[in-house]
């Protein structure tokens, strides 16, 4: 891999455990500040399904040799600078940071064929500039009924948009036509973002 990455070191990225949606928002913000010409090629990607039970492998919070965990949702960052070059920046993976799209998808999501339908993964892909404007969370989903925190929140103030105080559910929702961005099945997601070099060459003829 070349070392010309948007985020050379994972240690330089803002990270708070269990706040992946905010971690990715901060990555988008960093690109806008330091590499604005690349922002249009970047995406925030939410992974979930109707039952909010999505298995992911190679996760730091995972168990066993395969490091598998079942999340209600997960969020990662993608940079797609060229038709045949897409990089995934996941602050919670045990894979390299970043990882090429095909390797990340293959090892993190594997296949839906061996899973029950209720565990199939869907992906909401949101352009980074849209995510920066529309995402808003007052962190209510991380509070217990008594008001205490399930996990300690980030030290910075909540990320709030000008029009909404909490719209996280709109991003986690995987209903097509509702919420920002586009929703894909696993196979559709791969089809849209994984292009082999020879396929790109043929399409350009």
From Swiss-Prot:
GO terms for cellular component: cytosol; nucleus. One of its GO terms (molecular function) is protein-N-terminal asparagine amidohydrolase activity. Belongs to the NTAQ1 family. The keyword Hydrolase applies. Keywords: Hydrolase. Its EC number is 3.5.1.122. This is Protein N-terminal glutamine amidohydrolase. Monomer. InterPro entries: N_Gln_amidohydro_ab_roll_sf, NTAQ1, Prot_N_Gln_amidohydro_ab_roll. Gene3D superfamilies: Protein N-terminal glutamine amidohydrolase, alpha beta roll. It catalyses: N-terminal L-glutaminyl-[protein] + H2O = N-terminal L-glutamyl-[protein] + NH4(+). Pfam families: Nt_Gln_amidase. The active site is at residues 20, 74, 90. Mediates the side-chain deamidation of N-terminal glutamine residues to glutamate, an important step in N-end rule pathway of protein degradation. Conversion of the resulting N-terminal glutamine to glutamate renders the protein susceptible to arginylation, polyubiquitination and degradation as specified by the N-end rule. Does not act on substrates with internal or C-terminal glutamine and does not act on non-glutamine residues in any position. The gene is tun. It comes from Drosophila willistoni.
